[in-house]
Amino acid sequence: TPVTVTLSNGQVITVEAGKTQGSIDFQTPANDVYNNGSTVSVTIDSATGGNFEQLTPNPAAAVTTINDSIDTTTATLTANPSVTEGGVITYTVTLTNPAQTPVTVTLSNGQVITVEAGKTQGSIDFQTPANDVYNNGSTVSVTIDSATGGNFEQLTPNPTPAVTTINDSIDTTTATLTASPSV
């Protein structure tokens, strides 16, 4: 008669009469950007049938190692393309996958952006120098120095800088000539 084998994961294998083995497929967890591989361990909970005098399950576990393919999550920095002197540049970090834990991103200008768990973006403001009569605008280029956290397999900063043009607001300087009415 057939043998019914119940496994610790709830699955059941039937070994047909006259056969010595049976099998069943088990679906492993899907690949994602967070997991770093794992193992699956299954034992026999019970075995019945087969008209044996005594049917004793082997207590040893069948252990399978699930190899993980490393998936990359990228952190990209963006900013306003232009502001006027004295304006505010908003730097935004965008992740290609939501963070499971907070992500700390350190910028080349020393500022730090935190992307909260469950989110893909975080921002911080940078105050540009006030308008003055001497400077003629400039360009600010900022990159990501480091990015940590998120429980990602691999978190890679995009090396492309966030570039903002600081436009000069033209100030008029007036020169006045005065002379004494008599010499």
Please give the residue ranges for each predicted region.
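Beta-strand-rich interaction surfaces with strong enrichment in secreted/lumenal proteins
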Residues: 11-15, 30, 111-115, 130
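Extracellular lectin-like interaction modules
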Residues: 24-27, 37, 64, 68-83, ...
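Short, solvent-exposed loop/linker segments at the N-terminal edge
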Residues: 81-87, 181-183
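Short strand-edge motifs at loop-to-beta-strand transitions and within beta-strands
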Residues: 11, 20-24, 62, 111-113, ...
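Terminal edge beta-strands and adjacent linker/stalk segments
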Residues: 45-71, 145-172, 178-182
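Contiguous beta-strand segments of beta-sheet-rich domains
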Residues: 2-7, 21-49, 93, 101-106, ...
